[in-house]
Amino acid sequence: MNIVILAAGTGKRMRSALPKVLHPLAGQPLLAHVIDTARTLKPTHLVVVVGHGAEAVRKAVAAPDVQFAVQEQQLGTGHAVQQALPLLDPSAPTLVLYGDVPLTRAGTLQALTERAGQGGYGVLTVTLADPSGYGRIVRDAQGKVARIVEQKDATPEQLEIAEINTGIIVAPTERLGRWLAALKNDNAQGEFYLTDAVEMAIEAGLEVVTTQPEDEWETLGVNSKQQLAELERIHQHNVADALLVAGVTLADPARLDVRGTLECGRDVSIDVNCVFEGRVTLADNVTIGPNCVIRDANIGAGTRVDAFTHIEGAEVGANAVLGPYARLRPGASLHDESHVGNFVEVKNAVLGRGSKANHLTYIGDSDIGARVNIGAGTITCNYDGANKFRTIIEDDVFVGSDTQLVAPVRVKRGATIAAGTTVWKDVEADALVLNDKTQTSKTGYVRPTKKKS
């Protein structure tokens, strides 16, 4: 099977320099959703027709299995499909999809292609309470499809029809090419309508078959920011509903955003206003507090993530405690039972089993062993303005508050670093290291006061 995705439109009502099909829904372009769905049908040829913003669209969705055809002038859907014909297998049917209709289920498309068969013409339709703006499905006395009439070309009687054309069709490719070549643009829009091929198929002796989706929202398109926002909420509702069915506890399903894939184990609990981006895995008994953002991360079983924690590109072991207000940046790896507390940032660093950094700390480019205590205000000084260096802290080290570790440096097993120490040389095992500082007290000191004006 061939699949053609039309993505050449200007999207004027979006009022944006970004091509319409590249506006994000759930964290990825509208067009990417359509391509992902198309791939599940395993097409032999997958062609995207580009036009407005062609280079940006190519760059955004380029892949080995995606070919591109160019519609230099936007002369209608029939003209757009014509541009893809040279890239298609003429002996296989062609399914036509739209880059701004992102929520159609693969099963809906599969049902349409199966109904049409190898040589039939199939149209995906839907019956709406308010069909305004859509092409109407006109049927004959026997209930068979006779033609599709666009809204601007419809008679008052035809405007009363509630069954509308979604634009998604499947047709035999070789014959479709001949029908498209015969299209005329003598209509209100002055365009070559793909829908006009229906009458040609009927004249050629084909019965045009139809199927309908399970839900109306599967065929909704995006022409404005309002519609984009509506589809975002529909999609997020569907994601939340699937998580609930799978046993995930959501404090409020309406206040969850999944912008990628979220895999959850048993007894996972997610509080309000959390955002998950990229690929995120939450193992059994993970608890996510409110207002967290987690991107491309794996969280181990029993771990608790408290409020306002941001995690990106990190691996977290089992029974860890994060936050509130913690930040894990790419390359952070926290082993089992580790703690990263409020206003602690970890980047490209390993925190060993049972190690804790509970307050006001930066750990970057570091390897920290097991059972290490990192005191409040500790900083790993890893950057000299040009190069990054690593700090190595072995097992059972105690790092006092307000310590600066100037990398490259190693603190060996069991060492103790006194509060307020700057460490720029390696520390031996079980040693105490401190900077000698003299404390001076002056009795009877009078604090300066501001002069009164």
Swiss-Prot record:
Region described as Linker: spans on this chain: 226-246
Keywords per UniProt: Acyltransferase, Cell shape, Cell wall biogenesis/degradation, Cytoplasm, Magnesium, Metal-binding, Multifunctional enzyme, Nucleotidyltransferase, Peptidoglycan synthesis, Repeat, Transferase
Short name of one Pfam family: Hexapep
Region of interest (Pyrophosphorylase), ranges: 1-225
InterPro entries: Bifunctional_GlmU (IPR005882), GlmU-like (IPR050065), GlmU_C_LbH (IPR038009), Hexapep (IPR001451), MobA-like_NTP_Trfase (IPR025877), Nucleotide-diphossugar_trans (IPR029044), Trimer_LpxA-like_sf (IPR011004)
List of catalytic residues: 359
CDD domains per UniProt: GT2_GlmU_N_bac (cd02540), LbH_GlmU_C (cd03353)
Catalytically driven reaction(s): alpha-D-glucosamine 1-phosphate + acetyl-CoA = N-acetyl-alpha-D-glucosamine 1-phosphate + CoA + H(+); N-acetyl-alpha-D-glucosamine 1-phosphate + UTP + H(+) = UDP-N-acetyl-alpha-D-glucosamine + diphosphate
Superkingdom of origin organism: Bacteria
Stored Gene3D superfamilies: Hexapeptide repeat proteins (2.160.10.10), Spore Coat Polysaccharide Biosynthesis Protein SpsA, Chain A (3.90.550.10)
Cell compartment(s), UniProt: Cytoplasm
Binding-site positions, UDP-N-acetyl-alpha-D-glucosamine: 6-9, 20, 71, 76-77, 98-100, 135, 150, 165, 223, 329, 347, 362, 373
Pathway: Nucleotide-sugar biosynthesis; UDP-N-acetyl-alpha-D-glucosamine biosynthesis; N-acetyl-alpha-D-glucosamine 1-phosphate from alpha-D-glucosamine 6-phosphate (route II): step 2/2; Nucleotide-sugar biosynthesis; UDP-N-acetyl-alpha-D-glucosamine biosynthesis; UDP-N-acetyl-alpha-D-glucosamine from N-acetyl-alpha-D-glucosamine 1-phosphate: step 1/1; Bacterial outer membrane biogenesis; LPS lipid A biosynthesis
EC code(s) of this entry: 2.7.7.23, 2.3.1.157
Residue sites binding Mg(2+) per the record: 100, 223
A biological process from GO: cell wall organization
GO cellular component terms, A-Z: cytoplasm; membrane
GO molecular function terms attached to this record: glucosamine-1-phosphate N-acetyltransferase activity; magnesium ion binding; UDP-N-acetylglucosamine diphosphorylase activity
Record HAMAP family: GlmU
Family matches, as PANTHER family: BIFUNCTIONAL PROTEIN GLMU, NUCLEOTIDYL TRANSFERASE
Assembly information from the UniProt record: Homotrimer.
Protein family according to the UniProt entry: In the N-terminal section; belongs to the N-acetylglucosamine-1-phosphate uridyltransferase family. In the C-terminal section; belongs to the transferase hexapeptide repeat family.
Protein name: Bifunctional protein GlmU
Lineage of source species: Bacteria, Pseudomonadati, Pseudomonadota, Betaproteobacteria, Burkholderiales
